[in-house]
Amino acid sequence: FFVYAEAGDEVSFAAETQQVGNYAAAEMPVTVTAPSGEVVLEETVPFEEPTQISFTAPETGAYLVTADGGGNKMRLSDWSHPMALTGAGNEVRFMQYAGELSFYVPKGATLFGVRMWGEGVGEGVKATLMRPNGEVFGTTDNLVQTYQFEVELAEPSEGEVWALRTEQPGNAAWEDFYVDLRGIPPLLTPSGARLLV
């Protein structure tokens, strides 16, 4: 996760884990790293106990927040500041996430892709890609194998926000799936959070 803050801001968010199947119960380490590379917070979240986390930003910029739920489901929410999910150059993994994810298409962009796939045998998702005006660009259900929405804009982007809606698939198992933004900044923002651009 990235979260943007000005020097002196008090940044807060909630963290929690939920058990998945027979994976072992485990605490979740959370680390916040400043733009300079300095670690400003290290905290451990007890298993299945929602925890409020906060820190004072020592400098202005984007802070990297890392959390590892192991094989279990984890969630960071209720952000006080603009944030985005990032795979730091890799795909972002979701588990049974239903909702909208917003992303920014920068000024001048003409071509980008949204690549998705399920994990393992038969795990998938239903996905709908929406234009900035809310019009549906494309939709696919029971997305198990790799699929890519390929977007070629008629005119270069003026800087716009697109959305990806994910929901339970019609016939595939509803568990793990991945999202990989191609040709644009790999930053996804869940609905309800302020967009980091």
Q: How does the language model describe each region?
A:
Residues 1-197:
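Acidic, Ser/Thr/Pro
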